[in-house]
Amino acid sequence: MVLCFPLLLLLLVLWGPVCPLHAWPKRLTKAHWFEIQHIQPSPLQCNRAMSGINNYTQHCKHQNTFLHDSFQNVAAVCDLLSIVCKNRRHNCHQSSKPVNMTDCRLISGKYPQCRYSAAAQYKFFIVACDPPQKSDPRYKLVPVHLDSIL
């Protein structure tokens, strides 16, 4: 039993800093994390663009879509009619027009040497929106999750 406590303590220390793949960095609001992950008004090469995300999470994200639009324009989608999200919540909203976007997919590498392929697209998108937190931009609702691409 004496040996178990130090092993348990070591396990907790090693396990503590691990960030689940679906979580957002806690020092950011969900809206700010959405902006970092998905808003890119001017297209960047995927390897460069994804390094900004991967540096927060300390792993190679397998796939990510960048919307080539402003946060303001994407936040305006939150004012449109709400629809059901993939998770069955009713806080999703579909864009009224397609936008240019880039889909980045991991092809090789291990963090921090992640390598991505890029596919340019022109599609509609669906975002989940929530009320803003204190440090978020002042909108009635802000985008917090890219639910799907149509």
Swiss-Prot record:
Task: Give binding positions for substrate.
Answer: 61-65, 86, 105
Marked site (Facilitates cleavage of polynucleotide substrates) residue numbers = 59
Where along the sequence does the record put site: Critical for catalytic activity?
A: 61
Entry keyword set: Antibiotic, Antimicrobial, Disulfide bond, Endonuclease, Glycoprotein, Hydrolase, Lysosome, Nuclease, Secreted, Signal
**Cleaved signal peptide residues:** 1-23
Q: Name one GO biological process term.
A: defense response to Gram-positive bacterium
State a GO cellular component annotated for this protein.
extracellular space
Q: Which cysteines are joined by disulfide bonds?
A: 46-104, 60-114, 78-129, 85-92
What the entry lists under InterPro entries is as follows: RNaseA (IPR001427), RNaseA-like_dom_sf (IPR036816), RNaseA_AS (IPR023411), RNaseA_domain (IPR023412)
Q: Does the keyword Disulfide bond apply?
A: yes
Q: What is its main location?
A: secreted
Q: Could you tell me where this protein is found in the cell? A: Secreted; Lysosome; Cytoplasmic granule
Sites carrying sugar chains: 55, 100
Q: Which PROSITE patterns match?
A: RNASE_PANCREATIC
Q: Which Pfam families match?
A: RnaseA (PF00074)
Name the catalytic site residues: 38, 145
Tell me where on the tree of life, at the top rank, the source sits: Eukaryota
Q: What is its EC number?
A: 3.1.27.-
GO molecular function per UniProt = endonuclease activity; nucleic acid binding; RNA nuclease activity
Quaternary data: Interacts (via N-terminus) with bacterial lipopolysaccharide (LPS).
Record's family?
A: Belongs to the pancreatic ribonuclease family.
Function in brief: Ribonuclease which shows a preference for the pyrimidines uridine and cytosine. Has potent antibacterial activity against a range of Gram-positive and Gram-negative bacteria, including P.aeruginosa, A.baumanii, M.luteus, S.aureus, E.faecalis, E.faecium, S.saprophyticus and E.coli. Causes loss of bacterial membrane integrity, and also promotes agglutination of Gram-negative bacteria. Probably contributes to urinary tract sterility. Bactericidal activity is independent of RNase activity.
Q: What is this protein called?
A: Ribonuclease K6
| Organism whose genome encodes this protein | Pongo pygmaeus
